[in-house]
A protein has these predicted regions:
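Well-ordered, non-transmembrane segments within structured domains
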Residues: 82-96
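A generic structural motif
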Residues: 94-107
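A conserved hydrophobic secondary-structure block that centers on an alpha-helix together
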Residues: 78-81, 96-99, 113-116
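Structured catalytic cores of large enzymes
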Residues: 1-75, 86-90, 107-219
């Protein structure tokens, strides 16, 4: 019934015929019932309640406090990251927050690995400080990085992802510029670009706004 999309009838047999009116270009798609793709269910489908945006600026008493230092870590390194955070709280007088990558992805990129999610959290903390002089100053990427995001190589160390870039001038004459050993590069400066319109990391861009470092730990 062409007037009722909820009413349909399966057609069986080797041949199928139908009539159409001429006068307009139309597209028809035939689908083999044996060739359907079914969505895969995530192994860890349950999502724990969290609210990074609502808690990142809260101290233990629930009062607002500006953040000086952000540490991003995978869950299996969180104890070591907290040890480092406590060192700087005690000896450097810094307000430090440790956030796991999984929680960042869950809140800023629908649960999927995305370097933009990490940068967007930094940007949220940066622009929501109580005053410009109280903005976050340091970011620590607590984990090794790899050029292989998809973990296809053996003994891969893609723990905290890194920005991949290439020279756009080279891409005009080279379709493989993104994998060129000459024009492609990796950089953590991406996570410190806080101004609107920044983040492309082309051949010319403004300086970073935050000190960004990485500890190449894997165990």
């Amino acid at each position: 019934d062409i007037y009722n999309v909820a009413k349909y009838e399966n057609i069986f047999g080797a041949n199928f015929n139908f009539k159409i009116n001429l006068g307009a270009v139309k597209k028809y798609v035939a689908v083999d019932a044996n060739d359907f793709y079914f969505p895969l269910k995530e192994a860890a489908a349950a999502v724990v309640n969290q609210n990074i945006k609502g808690t990142i600026f809260k101290d233990l008493s629930g009062n607002f406090e500006d953040v000086d230092y952000l540490i991003f870590t995978p869950p299996f390194l969180i104890n070591q990251a907290e040890t480092l955070a406590n060192f700087h709280r005690t000896n450097s007088g810094l307000t430090v927050r440790v956030v796991t990558l999984e929680n960042i992805y869950q809140e800023f990129s629908s649960g999927k690995q995305d370097i933009a999610a990490i940068r967007n959290l930094v940007k949220y903390v940066y622009w929501n400080a109580s005053s410009p002089d109280k903005r976050v100053k340091y970011v620590n990427l607590f984990g090794d990085a790899s050029y292989d995001y998809k973990k296809r190589i053996t003994n891969n160390n893609n723990i905290v992802p890194v920005f991949h870039g290439f020279d756009p001038a080279d891409s005009e004459n080279n379709n493989n510029a993104n994998i060129s050993l000459y024009s492609s590069f990796m950089s953590d400066d991406f996570f410190g670009l806080m101004d609107d319109g920044e983040g492309t990391m082309t051949g010319s861009f403004d300086g970073i706004d935050i000190a960004v470092g990485r500890m190449l730990v894997s165990t």
